[in-house]
């Protein structure tokens, strides 16, 4: 409340009811376009014109007096929001504060801010920014006001009042006549206006005297008023002195008037000279004059360079800057140094009491009262940080002498807090200094807060996580000794800094869950919804990285519910979207991942909050890779590349790791090797064990594929040492699956299956279906091994179905592989969909689609031309009609199957997709090829058993003998006979006649038309 009360003078229009209305200038302003720049020398009536024009126009208005404090644009937006709130009817949401997360997108923030402000003001309205010359040219406010002018809505007017001309940044607006200029030539008094002012003073001056006054002042309002005041006290009009500047002329005449004023008035003016603004109470306290009310009213009424602003709960007065400069210079001449310092100190105390903190700090600084200045900074630092005014806070601390700064730990602490997000490295160093001072002073609470602050600074930078070790130890010690923290909000933040630090740096710690729950419980009691969302988001992130996805889902649901409440900032919303994107990536929900990423980026684009833009894109990239959508992944990578320069090593580590994953999916081993090496180097440099483990696993797999077994084993050994102590089931699942892939691919069956067994047990227990670096073909291969070995078959099948897995070489011979469609044609036709008959019922309607399916199988199931199909199925109709029949039948087949992708048509050729179909003909052909190349007796025996299990009889034995069917039947029968003849001969050559005869008898049971044993000769086999 003090801050709002303190701001009222700054945002209140001066009362100018007693001044001369300048109708000539009103007409100019009325005729001008939406924005006008009012410029002229001091004392020419700029502020008075702006205020009186507002009264004349009768518009809903907002007044803002700029000063040097507005160089920090966060201060500007803070007070502008206070001004808007004072005029709002309560229907609109409060305007946002420029907190650090907006700084990177200041232009977007500014545009959206003013769009909302203009909507709240409801056209027609007017805004006045007075005192633009007070703002340094280097301030970002220059750009802010340019954007505000460009965003000015129809029906809105804006006046900017300054002693100088518009800056170069506004040149385009001037060129397009969107900003007009009222300068000295327009502002100088006309002879008629000067005469009206003289007449109001009732000095009885004639026309010649007025002419003389006008000639001497050249239309300068301040000069005219001063000369009239001097004439009143001296009885004659003085000559204008030949001084080079208007300020010196002002000082000359003001000195004449001051010298002739009574002692009481002189004392009052000198005692109040240091006040930037005052109420009658404040002026009375400083001057000790009981007639303060009358004095100030008289100065205002006579326009003696004192303005009145009708603020609540009481009005405030301001000296014109020229008068204030004069009075302070006169005080320097008339008062002893110590008296001046006392007045400054007393003025500062009054400003502090009134809530004018900026003015109080400036006054304490000017009188070198460093202790009170530092005390005031420490008292109000938390509020300033919350308002986003870290630049102001840092500047104040910097203005303190070094010996004061380095002796006050809380001053250093707040200086660190003011810079944590924007310059985290400098912030960390300040926290370290504050920590040492707190420790020397025995301030245990201070040491905990400094340690927690240093942690957050390190986390904002994400460049060297090893720095966290020191502060983790500090918080551990504080926990053991029971350091009492001042509030639940502080408890939540401290616990939060601890568990996220443990996640990144010491994931082996078993107490991480306790720290998470402590933070969540402490945050729940807080009214600050953004604090609750901050803690909840980091908690969700941590449990996600530890593989507890069910718990992460619960936390995300709670966060989504909170996010719809009032007061939630864009930063909180984008943080939530970042966590949602990450979660969807982890659980391989590609659509949800892309949606959350897109929504987060849209909020960032709309608000200018780009804190998480890189991570949103990185998680979206990982989600696209996990979904196997390489096109979407490439598009996201293209967006990421321009951002890598500012990403930081941790984020770059993630990106390079994902680029290696991308390269593997594209089968570019060399690029994968290069990217994964870079990722591992950064993971080690950053000091994040979790990512070092993932990068070493990825690199080991790539090296194995490259044939570098020695380095592969070395990385696996280091990985084992890292992962062994980490209590993370998902990391264990990932590493064991990756190790199994490597081992099984290189013939280490026993160790590979042992690792696979443990991995699948974990996957089943915790419901895992994905990991970073997922390669569908490689995972499919190890799951084929699992099914062959009987390892967790139900879970393996569910994983295959959920992720649509098929190895590069389809596992046609693997029993239990959960094919979407199984088609038996050897010995009779049977179509199963997920092991249930599909073609039962509606046989007539399905006859033609099934015939098409049988034909495709007869022709090998792949790359069957449309013409070949139409020639076989519709031989008696013309081309167009045949094509229509083909198209219709294909549509009906896909509809019957319930999966359009199962039957593909590309460039006029039909294929059954091997990801969906198991055909006994395909399985037979593969087994036959394996058997023809087999040499070991045990291998031959196993393959024969499989062949006999698959080849159950002639192709489509129960179907009509169409030409295309008979051709396929004979081809397959011949292949069957040839491979069995080879095996028959193999057993004969080994002297195992009985086994050879048993084989022949089985062959006759299956295929009665097989040739007799006597014809199983090498020549026949060869032929």
Regions found by a protein language model. Name each.
Residues 301, 361, 381-382, 398-402, ...:
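Amphipathic alpha-helical segments of tetratricopeptide repeats
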Residues 44, 49-125, 134-136:
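Conserved phosphate-binding/catalytic loops and adjacent sensor/switch elements of nucleotide-binding enzymes
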Residues 3-5, 24-25, 48-50, 126, ...:
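Alpha-helical sensor/transducer elements of the RecA-like P-loop NTPase core
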Residues 375-382, 410-424, 448-464, 490-508, ...:
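Tandem amphipathic alpha-helical repeat scaffolds
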Residues 154, 312-314, 324-344, 370-371, ...:
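Intrinsically disordered, charged and Pro/Gly-enriched terminal/linker segments
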Residues 1-23, 788-846, 850, 900-911, ...:
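Short boundary/linker motifs that mark transitions into or out of structured domains
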